[in-house]
Structure formats: C-alpha cells, structure tokens
Amino acid sequence: MKPFEVPPWEEGADIIEFEPVNPSGNGVAAKKKPKKKKPKKKKAAVPNENLNVNKAAEKFTYRQGRGPLAPPQDSSDDDYEDVEDGIRAMHKVKSGRIEKQRPPTQATKGGKKELKLKPELAQAALEAMEATSSTTPAANSLASKLQSELLGGRFRYINEQLYSTTSRKAEALFRKDSSAFEAYHAGYRQQVEKWPINPLNRIIKTIKKIPKTAIIGDFGCGEGKLAQSVPNKVYSMDLVAARSDIIACNITDTPLQARTLDVAVYCLSLMGTDLNEFFLEANRVLKLHGTVYIAEIQSRFQDVREFVRCLNACGFDLNKKDVAVNYFYFFQFKKMRHVPKNTKMKAFSLKPCLYRKR
C-alpha cells in the first residue's frame, strides 16, 4: 500500500490516486483490531481457610437429608432411630403435647405402688378419712336434691287436691294425714321465694294504715304471719293450727260470733270449689260496711267481672281493685247488706293453680 501523499498544488487533483479499502460493518467504521486477552492469574491457596473448614467438619458431621443433630454417617440405623426418637419426644414435651415422663416409682412384689409416709402423717390422714367417710359433700348434695324433689312432688299433689275439691274434703285430707299440712307449707315457702313479690306484705302494709282498734280475721292464715306483723287483734284460722294462737277450723264454718269483725283477709286462700260458702261465712262474721281484702294469682281469673258479680250476690260491693300488678290481683270489697248463711246460690270457683314439675 502506497502512503498517502499530498501532491503539490501545482500538479492539480487529477494525479491523486486512492487505493480502495474494503469496508467493515456498515461501511462507515474502520476495521478494529482484536484485543488480546490477558491470562488469569491463579490464586494462591490460603492455609488458614482450609484449617477452619477442617475444624468445622470435625465439629459437625452431616447426613444427607438430616439436620445438624442427625447421627454421623458411620453410625448404625438403630442408633440413628434412637436419637431421632429422643429428639422427637423432646419437641413434643416443649410444645406441651405430652407430659414429661416421671421416674418410675418403686413397686412392691404384688405390683402395687408403695407409698411411704411418716407415722404422724399417716395417723392424721387416717383420722381425716374416718371423719369424712360417713358424710361427704357429694352425698349431702345428692340427698338434699332427692329430698327437695320428694318435697316438691308431695306439695304438687296436696295443692292439686285442695284446688279440685271442696273445703270439707280438704279438711278430711289433713285430718287423715297430719304431716300433709307441714309438707304443703314447706313446698309453699319454696314457691314464695320464686315470686317477684309476696302479696301478703302488701296486705300487711295496708292493714297498718287502718285504726288499731279494728278486729281482723285472717282466713286461711297458713303460718300466721299477719298476726305477727300488725298491732291489731287478729283471729288467725286455717285447717291445721301451726301455732297455739291459730284456730284450727274450716273457714266456711268458723267459731267466731256473728258481726264481730271489721276486716276479713283472704291472701292466696281461695282454694276449693265452693267459694260461695267462703263469702257467706265472711258476710256472717263481718260487721256492716266491713272490708274484705283479697289477693290471688292473676292466672286464676278467667273473668274478673264474673268474680265481682259472685261476690255481689254474697252481699259485697267492689270498692277497689288492682289488676295491673304483674302476677297478682288485689281486690277490696265492702259488706253492704246481710245475707243469710243458708242462702242457696250457685257454687263458683277460680281456675286451679297447678305447679308444674321443674
């Protein structure tokens, strides 16, 4: 290749000769010279690094598919399974899935565990067992429950008899079985505890507002709480006398003199199918314009107006009523005329109040 020379200006451009050059790539860039690769230098081995690797290998030996706690490769399968079972049990203990195994206790020849106690502790345990062997809380609870069920069952039976028979048959029932009265009132006390209010307390509050000279007759008094709660003279009457100051009699035929009472009280005592005889007796013993207080369970009244008409036939006019109170109705009647005891009239009653088994 001839070197590129610049011709003199006087010779002109015709004499300039160019040597063709083969283009590379797109014909624009000149052909590049290939670069020479430098040979890589080999790194020198570091003795300390090999030493650390050897120490780590000595400290931990690994088995394919196992963790750092796996047994070495040269160990037998039995040894490996024992170690694996121990690790698995350890994890179960930590996670709370199983309890820690307790060390086995020493057993006697018969296979039973032997418990060694000091003599004073053994004597104290023996005394405690003898003291509690006769009565235990569980036994007492069961006996109390059975006794309560028996009491409730007998109360329901007696209650049904009193509501579905006449007062004379109820009197015969209590005369035949003297313990029936106590059983009935024991069950009655249990029912009172379940009521939202005790209607007798309201009547007591009303009686305390009348003059202390007023004479009161408590018909079907039960345990005679009214006489103990007011300062007035009270004649407490029921089929069975729970106390010495209670008159045992049929409230349709009392021993009181005619026209001696100022107030007659019937608190949850309108039981039986002959209520007409109840109020004919009340008319006999009450003074003219005497007052009758009645408290009864709401569900027993099918028609309040019919009940008022029946008492009107017995000589009483309605003075006041409170049927808005939940669960109980309260009435106040006044005796307006005398009605002979032997007056014939249709018997009437209220719906029976039968307690269901709970």
UniProtKB/Swiss-Prot annotation:
Alphabetized GO MF terms: methylated histone binding; rRNA (adenine) methyltransferase activity
Enzyme Commission identifier(s): 2.1.1.-
UniProt xrefs under InterPro entries: RRP8 (IPR007823), RRP8_N (IPR042036), SAM-dependent_MTases_sf (IPR029063)
Region annotated Disordered, chain positions: 1-81
UniProt-annotated binding residues for S-adenosyl-L-methionine: H185, G220, D238, C267
Cellular localisation: Nucleus, Nucleolus
Main location: nucleus
Keywords associated with the record: Chromatin regulator, Methyltransferase, Nucleus, Phosphoprotein, Repressor, rRNA processing, S-adenosyl-L-methionine, Transcription, Transcription regulation, Transferase
Enzyme class: transferase
Phosphoserine, modified sites: S75, S76
GO biological process terms on file: cellular response to glucose starvation; rDNA heterochromatin formation; regulation of transcription by glucose
Record-level GO cellular component terms: chromatin silencing complex; nucleolus; rDNA heterochromatin
Disulfide bonds: none
Function: Probable methyltransferase required to silence rDNA.
Family under the similarity heading: Belongs to the methyltransferase superfamily. RRP8 family.
Name the record gives this protein: Ribosomal RNA-processing protein 8
Originating species: Drosophila melanogaster (Fruit fly)
